[in-house]
Amino acid sequence: MAKEIAKSLLDIEAVTLSPNDLYTWSSGIKSPIYCDNRVTLGYPLVRGAIRDGLINLIKEHFPEVEVISGTATAGIPHAAFIAEKLKLPMNYVRSSNKSHGKQNQIEGAKSEGKKVVVIEDLISTGGSSVTAVEALKLAGAEVLGVVAIFTYGLKKADDTFSNIQLPFYTLSDYNELIEVAENEGKISSEDIQTLVEWRDNLA
C-alpha cells in the first residue's frame, strides 16, 4: 500500500521532487520536496484509495473510535470521506478559535467523552497535529491517535508525538517515495543522496 500511494502522489504531482532547485516552505525551510495533498481531491480513484487506506489504519489501530476529526483545512475532506464510509460523527479543528460568532475552534460533532481519531493530510513536524489534539482534549475528548496520508519522516515529528505520548500512522513516507521515484526514473542515485542528506540534516 505504501508504494502504491507514493506512486499515486508522484503521478498526480501531489508530491514533487526538485533536488537541484529547492522549494521554500511557508516556514522558510528550503526543501527538495513539496507536498500538496489537496491535489488528490481532483482524482476520485486516488482519493478513494487514500480513504480506504486510512480506514484500514483506523480499524487496525483504533477500532474503538467514536468520532472522526479533521485538521483544518487539508484534513477536512479526507475526514469527511472516512466518516461517511464508517457512518461516524465528524468534526474539524481550526488552528485557532474563530474571531467571531461563538469563537469555536472545533466545528461539528461534540467531542466530550468521545474516543477521537485525528485525520491529517501531511505530517512534517507534527505541530498542527498537536494543536488539534490539545484542542480536542480541552473539549473533553479522548484522543486515540492520528492517521495521515504522508510523512517526511523527520525526527522532530517523532519527538513531537512522543512528547504527548500519542501514536501516529501514515499510508506512505519519505523513504518509500524516494524509492518509487528512483524506480520510475524520476530521480537519479545522486538525487537520492541529496534527498536523504536534506532529511537527515533537517531532522
UniProtKB/Swiss-Prot annotation:
**One GO term of the biological process aspect:** pyrimidine nucleobase biosynthetic process
What sort of enzyme, by top EC class, is this? transferase
Residues reported to bind orotate? 124
HAMAP family membership: PyrE
Q: Which organism is it from?
A: Staphylococcus aureus (strain COL)
Per the record, the gene is: pyrE
Pfam family of the protein (one):
Pribosyltran
**Where does the signal peptide begin and end?**
none
| CDD domains linked | PRTases_typeI
**Family (UniProt):** Belongs to the purine/pyrimidine phosphoribosyltransferase family. PyrE subfamily.
E.C. number, please?
2.4.2.10
The record ties this protein, via SUPFAM superfamilies, to: PRTase-like (SSF53271)
How would you summarize the oligomeric state and partners of this protein?
Answer: Homodimer.
- What are the recorded GO MF terms, alphabetically? magnesium ion binding; orotate phosphoribosyltransferase activity
Q: Which UniProt keywords apply?
A: Glycosyltransferase, Magnesium, Pyrimidine biosynthesis, Transferase
Function in brief: Catalyzes the transfer of a ribosyl phosphate group from 5-phosphoribose 1-diphosphate to orotate, leading to the formation of orotidine monophosphate (OMP).
Kindly give the InterPro entries that the UniProt entry links to this protein.
OPRT, Or_phspho_trans_dom, PRibTrfase_dom, PRTase-like
- Indicate yes or no for the key word Magnesium: yes
Q: What name has this protein been given in UniProt?
A: Orotate phosphoribosyltransferase
| Catalytic reactions of this protein | orotidine 5'-phosphate + diphosphate = orotate + 5-phospho-alpha-D-ribose 1-diphosphate
Which residues of the sequence carry a binding annotation for 5-phospho-alpha-D-ribose 1-diphosphate? Answer: 94, 98, 100, 120-128
Q: In which pathway does it act?
A: Pyrimidine metabolism; UMP biosynthesis via de novo pathway; UMP from orotate: step 1/2
What cofactor does this chain's UniProt record say it requires? Mg(2+)
